[in-house]
Structure formats: C-alpha cells, structure tokens
Amino acid sequence: MSVTGGCKMDDLRKPASRNEIKIFDPREASTGLGGAELTDASVVQRNEQWWMYLAGQARGYGATDIYSASLPPGAPLSATGWKLTRGATGELVPVAGRNFSSAWDGHGGRHCPSHVKGWDPRKGEWAERIYYAGAAVNLWGPYTIGFLEWDGEKWIDQPELAFAANEEWERGSVYEPNLIYQDGKWKMWYVAGSNQEDYLVHGYVESEDGSTGWSKHAVFAPSEMKMFDFCVRPRGDAFDAIFSRVWVGEGTPPPETGLWWCRAHKPWGRLSDWSEPIQIMTAEDRGWHSSPWKRSFQFHGQTAESALVFFDGSYRTGDPTPFPIAFTLGCLTIDLPLGSVFNAPKSA
C-alpha cells in the first residue's frame, strides 16, 4: 500500500516477533464474559495499575455502555490476566451512570472509548477523561462525541457533548475518537460518515480545552482508504500510530484490509506527513477474528520495541438470527522497530 506524499523512515525494519491471543469471546466461557459482548478497548496505566475501558452490551442487547477491566496493581502490561469490574452480585458495572448525558447518548448508547489526560485551562487543572461516541436515538448512529471526566473518586457523565459534525463531508455523524494531549492541545483523530453507507472519512481537529474552540474540521485520510481509527502514542523522541483499514462492503476484503503502523516526529494532522505505513495484520480469517479494527496499543516502556496491540474481531455464529455475528477482543504482541531517521514532513 502506498500513501501519496508519505515521508520515509530510512532505517525502518519490518516488524517481527509476533504473537496473538484471544482475550474476550461472548461464546467462550473461559474468557469470563458470560454472554456479554465487550470490545473497543482503550488501555492505559493509572496509578501503577493497568486499566482497559471497553464498550459493549452486558446482556448482548440494548444501548451500549462503557465498562472496565484491570490487571492487579503493580502487574506489568499483559495480554492475559484481565479482570472485569463487577458489582456485588457479579453483574458487569458500567463505569458511569447517565445522570446528565442521556439527551445525547441515552438510547443509542456509548461507543469506542478513548482515555486521555490533559490540561483544562478553564479549571486551571489536569483533567482525566474517557472520550466516546454517543448516539441519542439509534445504536447505529448518527453519533456525536463527548466524554466522562474523573472527579477524583468516580467517572462523571457530562450534560453537553464536546464535538459534532459541521462539515458537509462529515455527513452528520462523527465517531471513533482517538485523542492525545500534546504541545498544549487536545488532538483528536476521528471517523466521519457511516458504516451503513460504506462512506468513511478520517478527520482531525485540536482544541485548547478538549470541549470547545475546536479547529476547523480537516480531512486526515480520504474515504477511499476506509481508515476506521488512528491511535497515537509517544515513544522516545517521536510518535507511533496504528490504524485499521476496514471493509464494510460485500465479498472478500481486499488485501489492504487490516492493521497498519507508521511513525512521525510530531503527531501531525495529515496522514501524508507520517511515515509510509506498514501492514502488521491482514484480514485473514483466524476462526475467532478476521478483518481486525479498533486498536489500542502500548509499549513496554518509552524506548521499547515490544508493543501490545489490542484489537476487535468478529466471526459468524451460524445462528438463524438477523445478526449472526459474535464480536471478540484480541491482543497482538509484536516488535515495532524504533527507526531513527525521518525525512522532514511537508508541514514542518
């Protein structure tokens, strides 16, 4: 795959040493879901403990919500050992109620969480948030984007959404947010369009407070790429990104469907300013997943090459139902070389 105008990493080696494992499967009792479907992981370390925030349906139906799982305090990041957060009677517990946000996420639910911590100049303090796409009416959208905010004890839902479509090319719906806080700005990559219409454009914006004053909504990647998410992480003196290219049409997915990796000196708002992407997973049918999407990843340290890439998958169940598909969550462990030499991007 070639991205026109992409900058190069002169010494980049091909990824190596890969292994993948299934974490959650609603039809496999050993994964502990008990029939629930939880995917869209956002993985983060909070106070010396690794947490995973997930979107899904605790009973396999109804409006989706955000749930959590964690590793034991002090344990290193791992693909295994995740324990879902449950209530006193064993039920899955959402991370927050709908005390204020139901007007914009009440019936269609909460989708695709993205954890981030950044400075809120309005309050004059650091804010920890879980951004997500909310649907007011229908599970399938249209969507807007808002967040839950940590108050020191619990996650609090917000009465106002933070971001909505306002450009013609967005077609009234924005979702799949991925955020970082860098250089005094909340930077967000997101999907605009609709899966049902097979129209997916990737956008980019930034804001000083993460809820108002967003920059002009800019196209990050065109619709023909079918980019579904773009997750960015700092590493060393540069930034890594892993994204998925999806296939929501009929027939066999084309070879470019799957997960891709690229790097850049800065978290640029144009795909052409990142390195030439390298495919790290294809749409090959592995039984419990094919055509992976919605990845979150972390490295084993700021200069490490070993990355854990959490991703969504699905498989057909064969059930005589209108939607005979089960959604799974997996993890790919892969070595991603640092690479040290970049050509200067055009926007530098």
Q: Which residues does each predicted region cover?
A:
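Carbohydrate-active catalytic/glycan-binding domains of CAZyme proteins
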Residues: 2-348
